[in-house]
Amino acid sequence: MSIKLQLALDFVDLHRALLVAEKAVPAGVDWVEAGTPLIKSEGLDAVRELKRRFPDKTIVADMKVMDAGRIEVEAAAKAGAHLIDVLAAASDATILECVQAGKNYGAKIVVDLIAVPDPVARARQVEALGVDYITVHVPIDEQMRAQDPFATLKAVSEAVSVPVGVAGGINSETAAQAVAHGAAYVIVGGAITKAKDPEAATRELRRALDEGAVIPTDLFKRAGEAEILRVLSMVSAANLSDALHRAGVLEGIRPLFPGIRLVGRALTVRTYPGDWAKPVEAIDAAQPGEVLVIDAGGVGPAIWGELATHSALQKGVAGIVVDGAIRDAGDIMRLQFPVFTRLVMPNAGEPRGFGEIGVPIRIGATRVETGDYLVGDDDGVTVLPQRLAVEYANRAMDVLEKENRIREEIKEGRTLAQVTDLLRWEKKI
């Protein structure tokens, strides 16, 4: 049996969806989906246009029907959809109406198990209601928490006789795994729609499905806790701040020299302005790869210099962030040690021992705790709280992937405003 590849066009702008589809569909896509964001933004005209552009392909309308089943299925079918998605969380009455309307208008019904508490039980129930397909779906927001669909996919595919598909972060590494767990169709979104080359990405996925190949990728996959530092090493401070809803920035903290790069977990220090005792003692307390984050009140005198830097390098400290002042800037630059600071000045204070190591501190409006993650580069430093680390490291990667796609569209001759349809999406007040 040939495994169907479904392309999920989860854009809000039809012109961007069509640009990707025109490149990807000829490379091996079987089913072309107007994603939920696209339908909400552009209406069923998105389905009509996909039907016009790809008359020989199966068109999917991801309506996520929850109520008014007959009305929504009829509308989508008349617009040209062959397959229409309905939520498994909908009532049996709604699903039955969808099934009947689908029969009347020549469309098939796909039930999406997203967020149902017992997917196997609900799959059996909706199969009995007469649906044509069932999709196991890990939603985007759960993907960001490193959830995957494969155990549920296997259980559902073994429990029902209708074709079962899968959606939720599938990429060239995991597509074959989806097939091995029982998928009859595989839904792919970001691994194609965010790829620099959608055609090449589609060909890789097609090969993975047809040959059972595992094709490694650094993108379009979500990391667990053990891989947080790897993910953060790939993203920028700006990517991470965007993921955190433009937050997490240590305002006023700047890199000591250009080209600097810092990724690590925080060991916090609070000290009196100019008192360098606790910062130097923290070097001995630090584990290799940790970053010293020092609250020195945002003022001088300096609490860090060349000799402390030599000690930190020997200990394997990844870098230092100082809300205060450092000195010996030229020597530190020659050592290429990552330093981010508010101030640089020649005068140091005295080691009086006032302060603490490992306590929560605040730099500007941002709280930093020992164990939090930091990403620093030419733009400055962004802090990722450890309690949010898995989800928002993955969201930062999602930001990077989306920017990669936008950059390619700009290179093709359009402006940023044109690619993002900026005027259309300005907030109306």
Where are these regions (language model features)?
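Feature captures the catalytic cores and cofactor-binding loops of soluble hydro-lyases/lyases
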Residues: 217-370, 383-429
